Amino acid sequence: MGSSKLLVAFTLIVMMTISYDLFTGIGIDARTVPPTCYESCNATFQNPECNKMCVGLAYKDGSCIYPPPEVDGLPPKRPYFPRCCCNPIILSPPSP
């Protein structure tokens, strides 16, 4: 019985620690995601919706593409889908 109480207490402490925002108390209100596609961008590609789609994609001819051009030297199985150029993205913290 004592070990089950200890397990429940430990689980609650872990859950509270994970859900508690540690950075709020020190004034960090946003995080910056570095761009993955940024060379030769033009104004038509620079908007928040494009930036959201572009993170993590490959870059080619002024835009992001999916899938990446080659994986381990093999050509892609699917056609390229051009995406938008990226600027650094400022993400606001999740709302409570």
Swiss-Prot record:
Disulfide bonds: C37-C86, C41-C64, C50-C84, C54-C85
GO cellular component terms listed in the entry, alphabetical order: extracellular region
Keywords: Antimicrobial, Disulfide bond, Fungicide, Plant defense, Secreted, Signal
Gene Ontology biological process: defense response to fungus; killing of cells of another organism
Key word Secreted present: yes
Family the entry assigns: Belongs to the DEFL family.
Protein name: Defensin-like protein 69
Species: Arabidopsis thaliana
